[in-house]
Amino acid sequence: MKKILLVMALALGWQQAAMAGFTEGATAYNNKNYAVALKEIRPLAQAGNADAEHLMGLMYYMGRGVPQDYKTALEWHRKAALKGKADAQYVVGAMYYTGNAVIQDHKQAVSWFRKAAEQGHPDAQQVLGLMYRYHIGGMPQDNVIAYMLWNLAAANGSMNAAEQRAAVVKTMTQEQIEEGQALSAGWKLNTPLPQKSRTGGG
């Protein structure tokens, strides 16, 4: 029992130290002190901390404190994305969408955007809505799902989503609008998003 408690205490101590190190690194990054950020963040990323992996990805993507390297950026973002980091999932989706450092693959982009969107990531919700609206990446054209996603993203502060919603609503029937409202009102965070609506297409 004492050994178990000791292991738990050591793990908790490491987590607290890691959090302190990440906070220092993130603060340095935001203050444009990239050398300090790299010193604090790299060991945490190498130890598998998802937040640090994501920040390392950003540093390589932007060329801040390290040479700009999109492939390395993708590797770090993917590590964090596989651990469930929504911001990283969004970036991986965007890189697949544009073909940046990877072969362009809209279906892969959809998969990553959906993972982030289901965690409430407003940019992922907004982009996924566009993919439904304009039938991208093998998505069915579905204005109701697009409206639902933009409703969610707008509620999370996305002005782009609010503008897209205002545009698409002009093309929708009252029945479609009501379904979109009901879908967004009934959806729960961290649950699967619907892939098609009842009243549907464009």
Feature locations, PLM:
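Positively charged n-region of N-terminal signal peptides that target proteins for export
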Residues: 1-4
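Hydrophobic face of amphipathic alpha-helices that form TPR/SEL1-like repeat modules
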Residues: 21-28, 43-44, 55-62, 91-98, ...
